[in-house]
From Swiss-Prot:
Phylogenetic placement of the source organism: Eukaryota, Metazoa, Ecdysozoa, Arthropoda, Chelicerata
Entry note about domains: Has the structural arrangement of an alpha-helix connected to antiparallel beta-sheets by disulfide bonds (CS-alpha/beta).
Gene3D superfamilies: Knottin, scorpion toxin-like (3.30.30.10)
Keyword entries, A-Z: Disulfide bond, Ion channel impairing toxin, Neurotoxin, Secreted, Signal, Toxin, Voltage-gated sodium channel impairing toxin
Organism: Tityus pachyurus
GO molecular function, one term: sodium channel inhibitor activity
Protein name: Toxin Tpa8
Residue ranges annotated for the LCN-type CS-alpha/beta domain, each copy included: 24-98
TM ranges: none
Length: 101
């Protein structure tokens, strides 16, 4: 009896883990963003990197992300919800932007 109850508990925990929503990082697709390098992501980049990072942080939180920074001329967001579309980029680019956060 104890083994079957333990199996049920483990199975229940497994189902809970499957249902957990994961978050992703990337360049969010923004209608009308028009960055020449990253499709429809929000373009940033100015002489003042603090204002570019603040701009990107605002963009990213508006689309449901935790935060964002200007990376390689476009806004790169952290902890975006799964339903947010992101621009397809090489893994190396994504890893770079995650590293320099």
């Amino acid at each position: 009896m104890v083994k079957s109850e333990m199996k049920l508990v483990i199975f229940s925990l497994f189902l809970l883990l499957i249902g957990v929503e994961s978050l992703k990082n990337g360049y969010p697709v923004i209608e009308g963003g028009g960055s020449p390098d990253y499709g429809e992501s929000a373009e940033c980049g100015s002489e003042d990197s603090n204002s570019a990072d603040n701009f990107c942080n605002d963009i990213c939180t508006n689309v449901g992300g935790k935060s964002g920074d200007c990376c390689l001329g476009s806004c790169f967001c952290f902890d975006l919800p799964d339903e947010q579309k992101t621009v397809e980029v090489m893994d190396r680019t994504k890893e770079y932007c995650e590293f320099v956060e």
